[in-house]
Curated annotation (Swiss-Prot):
It comes from the Bacteria. This protein specifically binds sulfate and is involved in its transmembrane transport. Residues 1-40 form the signal peptide. CDD domains: PBP2_CysP. InterPro entries: Sulphate/thiosulphate-bd_CS (IPR000957), Sulphate/thiosulphate_BS (IPR034408), Thiosulph/SO4-bd (IPR005669). GO terms for molecular function: molecular carrier activity; molybdate ion binding; sulfur compound binding. This is Sulfate-binding protein.
Length: 352
């Protein structure tokens, strides 16, 4: 697939308008105007992403559309759909016509690939293996609580009520579960010990919300739980919005959470406007876009931008990658498919 060579040099603000498509939506468009190719037909793109990326994309998209308009004269409209990564993946496979997907884990993109909608090799179509953001798992506690939660083992304390999303619908929750499991198996424990520990932690969860954003609402707005397991970026964003609860980044063990992006080939080939879609994906890796990801809580993949935010994103020494779990294809089958480890843990503790 040919990629467009497109230079990016400045940013201006675009106009946001609310639209509707599915899950949680907005529409972003450029204003009509003159450009090098003003007669070029307008393009409409649908971005399908996971819940906690919304704040970042709603800042990035207007900058892209204005720069694209200035460079090419083409008006671009974005429709945006946000929800749990697993739910969003199923929606695309079931017919939601996405041009671009930005999901919580590569296995979700691989499911769309397996459905024949994305061509093999999508990982090589963008920089950094098409991983556009990184994050880690954070523990959020409450200043009013006397319960101490500083490391993974503390989550098994019967007095601790844990808020984490459901791995069946949330990509973030799958990362959380791998964190729970890996905190035992990657630090010298056995799988039997990990199974027992995971059961204790999930037994301490009063609810399993559908996605990371809903987990945040359950914890902050509904007041449930003593500790919230969530993306570091979601915690930092909540802090920016006034929810200033204490949090820690577990240092005894953590997981590097990688967010992939891909073009949905069947959609863009049908519409015949691959150039602008490819350009948008490439734009996500520019310093301008990476700066916005960093400002909205994500660890940028651009090293220069990451260096600027070093104090905000402390290095984690014992940091595992998905490859240490055998890659997402193996991890998905082993942990989260029907009858996998998560289902077995839920069955053991008698939870539906």
């Amino acid at each position: 697939m040919a990629r467009s060579a497109f230079g990016w040099g400045f940013s201006v603000i675009a106009v946001l308008m609310v639209g509707s498509i599915t899950a949680c939506n907005t529409t972003t468009t450029t204003e009509p105007g003159q450009g090098e190719n003003a007669s070029q037909a307008p393009a409409n793109l649908t971005l399908v992403s996971y819940a906690v990326t919304r704040d970042a994309f709603e800042k990035i998209i207007p900058k892209f559309t204005e720069e694209w308009k200035s460079k090419t004269g083409q008006d671009v409209t974005f429709e945006q759909s946000y929800g749990g990564s697993g739910s969003q993946t199923r929606a695309v496979v079931d017919g939601l016509e996405a041009d671009i997907v930005a999901l919580a884990l590569s296995s979700d993109v691989q499911k769309i690939e397996s459905a024949g909608l994305i061509q093999p090799g999508w990982e090589q179509e963008a920089p950094n293996g098409s991983i556009v953001t990184n994050s880690v798992i954070a523990f959020v506690t409450k200043a009013s609580d006397n319960i101490k939660v500083e490391k993974w083992a503390d989550l098994a304390n019967p007095e601790v009520k844990v808020i984490t999303a459901n791995p069946k619908t949330s990509g973030g929750a799958r990362w959380n579960f791998l964190g729970i499991w890996g905190s035992v198996t990657k630090t010298g424990g056995t799988e039997e010990q990990a199974f027992d520990f995971a059961g204790k932690v999930l037994a301490n969860a009063p609810v399993l919300p559908k996605d990371a954003r809903e987990s945040t609402d359950v914890f902050y707005k509904q007041g449930q739980g003593n500790v919230l397991l969530n993306y570091e970026n979601e915690v930092l964003l909540a802090k920016q919005k006034g929810e200033n609860q204490p949090y820690i980044i577990p240092q005894d063990f953590n997981v590097s959470i990688s967010g992939p992006v891909a073009v949905v080939d069947t959609t863009v080939d049908k519409k015949g406007t691959r150039e602008v879609r490819d350009a948008f994906v490439q734009y996500l890796f520019t310093p301008e876009a990476q700066q916005i990801f960093a400002e909205t809580g994500f660890r940028p993949v651009n090293e220069e931008v990451l260096a600027k935010f070093a104090s905000q994103y402390p290095k984690v020494e014992n940091l595992a990658t998905i490859e240490e779990f055998g890659g997402w294809k193996k991890a998905q089958a082993e942990f989260f498919d029907e009858g996998g480890i998560f289902d077995k843990v839920i069955t053991k503790i008698g939870r539906q």
